[in-house]
């Protein structure tokens, strides 16, 4: 049910930041020396200043001003989409009139967000009509961005790619994909990179939850959230360690608060007292990075008091005897020395988790973004195995991921060490996916520098700087990286800012593809002491459509897959990411191979692009390892139309058929989560 405003909306005052860009900041550039760059904290100020060179939109308007006056009398269309601000997967109904996204409502029947918005999700519409959209392709010329045509951009970029491939090999190009791409675009980008002849590709997961994926996979098979946000309502105890869900994943707290109403005991372990900690029954302040001593301290009390699930361990866990030996070394005094946590608090946490089963453990960036993040994650998993909580409703490890499709991009997207669905890079994996893609294995192999490089992991987003700056004998490929694509990713959240700037300046080509002019574009434009370090470098900005200007599927943190409907047409000269991939592949000479088993449909301006539905079916045909095989676009759309049929605790369909397709959804779990 839509809560519809009957009267017209009032005028909106321009934001202060927008006004400042149009005023004083717009006069501050075009150049900035190194000293000023450092004084203004490098990246943050640089973004705002360099943004004055870029194409920014002011306010969304109807194409026909006269039509805008009569817009309220026009037909309103409701499009169902999914919020892009975190991994909960909140469904949103977008109301479109006269081609403009005029209003939004949370989907009250959604079993994931239960009809709720958070402050971030409530501003979702701004992605369609925000002030800072990149309007048209641009190229950096003499320190300033100048407008160019799409034809010029694609021609020059593809020519440079082919030149670099001929002179330095395909591994001289590195592609950073995006956890904002939908599943279809993520899989297509991995295919695109493979057909160019390299494994040099990555995305945001590398610097957020790659430690989770590896740590959890090495503990019990696959690296993903074991249960669901909803299932936490069945937990009798929950320990948040390294997660501030109240601010990072606000809607997820609804499920925790429902659990607390049912008597769930909530523990928060964090160096900071957060908004999540404010809701806890027990708050424990540990020293940053001391997660493992704390978790082993809990296990020490669990083993000492015989609280471990002995039958579960005997039947289902291997190696717990080795864990006991290590845990025995972590006596309460050593734990307190390492963590700063008194024994009584550690004992209380252990007792709460042991006496209130099933109990769950929740973590996020606080555990993963450490040099030993993989080991921290495994320690959390071991705790749950000792308590016998894994594989049980209300238990497990509920791992809150960040972006709306970081799980899906990890599952099927541009990973440097695997093909879609974690197939690895061995010959058999390549032959499997070549058959799925409808291309000859020998042809794909011929695109690589060698079979050895074809089966070797590529450069990661956390080390691309080294791939550019280090001596060639210190990197594991024939050539240094000479060109980088930032395709929906801005690296300004990473460390080593000055080295990053040096790496950008050393590149032969830098391509930024994004709906917004990001910090990457701003850093690339900054001169060093008033001089252009590499005047021969080519820098391009290409306007991509947002995820609300295309359709496709996204995978929430609990692995439920949801289908987004296209809300509005791509604004200005922006194009969908999969259209850009296809058009670039055409220029590079493998356009036919890229879409060999895909259906082409008219997109913006009647230009052809791969159909998202056919891309998902290709994923279904190939992803047997993780069971991404039954999530057909038709069935996902049926789930989105019939959210009211799914239980808000179990996510299982209580019974009913989809009126449009006749599918019997009885027994389906919402979004058909794998495995």
Residue positions per predicted region:
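N-terminal export/assembly segments and adjacent metallocofactor-ligating motifs
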Residues: 2-307, 319, 329, 334, ...
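Intrinsically disordered/low-complexity terminal segments and short unstructured peptides
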Residues: 3, 30, 35, 68, ...
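Generic extreme N-terminus detector
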Residues: 4-5, 36, 416, 423, ...
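Intrinsically disordered, low-complexity serine/threonine-rich segments
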Residues: 20-23, 27, 55, 362, ...
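Residue-level detector of bioactive/disordered segments in secreted/extracellular proteins
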Residues: 85-88, 92, 120, 602-607, ...
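Non-catalytic alpha/beta scaffold blocks inside enzyme catalytic domains
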Residues: 210-382, 386-392, 400-621, 625
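Long, low-complexity segments enriched in small/aliphatic residues
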Residues: 409-410, 415, 609-675
């Amino acid at each position: 049910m839509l809560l519809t405003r009957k009267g017209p909306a009032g005028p909106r005052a321009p934001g202060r930041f927008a006004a400042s860009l149009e005023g004083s900041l717009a006069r501050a550039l075009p150049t900035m020396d190194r000293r000023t760059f450092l004084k203004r904290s490098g990246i943050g100020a640089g973004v705002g200043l360099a943004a004055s060179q870029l194409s920014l939109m002011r306010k969304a308007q109807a194409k026909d001003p006269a039509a805008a006056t009569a817009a309220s009398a026009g037909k309103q269309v409701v499009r169902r989409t999914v919020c892009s601000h975190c991994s909960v997967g909140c469904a949103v109904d977008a109301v479109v009139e006269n081609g403009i996204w005029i209003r939004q409502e949370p989907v009250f029947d959604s079993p994931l967000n239960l009809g709720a918005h958070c402050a971030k999700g409530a501003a979702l519409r701004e992605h369609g009509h925000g002030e800072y959209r990149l309007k048209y392709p641009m190229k950096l010329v003499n320190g300033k961005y100048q407008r160019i045509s799409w034809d010029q951009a694609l021609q020059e970029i593809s020519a440079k790619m082919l030149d670099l491939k001929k002179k330095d090999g395909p591994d001289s190009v590195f592609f950073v994909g995006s956890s904002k791409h939908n599943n279809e675009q993520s899989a297509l980008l991995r295919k695109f990179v493979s057909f160019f002849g390299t494994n040099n590709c990555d995305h945001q997961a590398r610097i957020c939850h790659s430690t989770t994926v590896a740590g959890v996979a090495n503990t019990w098979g696959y690296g993903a959230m074991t249960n669901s946000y909803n299932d936490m309502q069945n937990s009798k105890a929950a320990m948040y360690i390294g997660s501030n869900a109240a601010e990072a994943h606000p809607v997820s707290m609804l499920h925790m608060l429902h659990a607390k109403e049912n008597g769930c005991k909530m523990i928060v372990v964090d160096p900071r007292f957060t908004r999540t900690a404010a809701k806890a029954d027990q708050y424990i302040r540990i020293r940053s990075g001391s997660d493992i001593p704390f978790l082993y301290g809990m296990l020490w009390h669990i083993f000492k008091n015989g609280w471990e699930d002995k039958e579960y361990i005997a039947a289902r866990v291997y190696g717990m005897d080795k864990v006991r030996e290590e845990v025995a070394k972590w006596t309460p005094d050593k734990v307190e020395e390492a963590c700063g946590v008194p024994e009584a608090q550690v004992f209380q946490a252990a007792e709460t988790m042991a006496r209130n089963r099933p109990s769950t453990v929740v973590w996020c960036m606080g555990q993963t973004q450490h040099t030993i993040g993989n080991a921290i994650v495994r320690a959390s998993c071991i705790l749950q195995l000792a308590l016998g909580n894994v594989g049980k409703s209300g238990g497990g490890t509920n791992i809150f991921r960040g972006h709306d499709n970081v799980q899906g991009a990890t599952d099927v997207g541009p990973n440097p060490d695997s093909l879609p669905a974690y197939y690895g890079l061995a010959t058999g994996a390549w032959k499997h996916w070549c058959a799925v893609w409808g291309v000859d294995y020998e042809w794909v192999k011929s695109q690589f520098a060698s079979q050895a490089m074809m089966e070797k992991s590529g450069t990661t987003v956390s080390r691309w700087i080294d791939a550019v700056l280090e001596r060639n004998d210190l990197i594991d490929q024939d050539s240094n990286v000479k060109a980088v694509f930032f395709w929906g990713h801005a690296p300004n959240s990473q460390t080593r800012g000055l080295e990053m700037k040096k790496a950008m300046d050393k590149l032969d080509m830098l391509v930024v593809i994004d709906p917004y002019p990001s910090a990457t574009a701003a850093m690339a434009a900054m001169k060093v002491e008033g001089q252009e370090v590499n005047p021969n470098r080519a820098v391009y900005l290409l306007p991509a459509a947002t995820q609300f200007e295309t359709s496709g599927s996204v995978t929430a943190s609990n692995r439920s897959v949801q289908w987004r409907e296209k809300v509005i047409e791509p604004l200005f000269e922006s194009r969908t990411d999969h259209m850009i991939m296809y058009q670039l592949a055409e220029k590079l000479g493998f356009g036919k191979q890229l879409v060999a088993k895909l259906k082409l449909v008219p997109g913006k301006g009647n230009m052809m692009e791969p159909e998202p539905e056919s891309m998902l079916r290709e994923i279904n045909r190939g992803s047997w390892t993780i069971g991404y095989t039954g999530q057909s676009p038709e069935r996902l759309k049926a789930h989105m139309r019939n959210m009211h049929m799914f239980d808000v605790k179990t996510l299982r369909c209580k019974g009913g058929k989809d009126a449009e397709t006749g599918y019997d959804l009885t027994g389906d779990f919402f979004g058909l989560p794998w495995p």
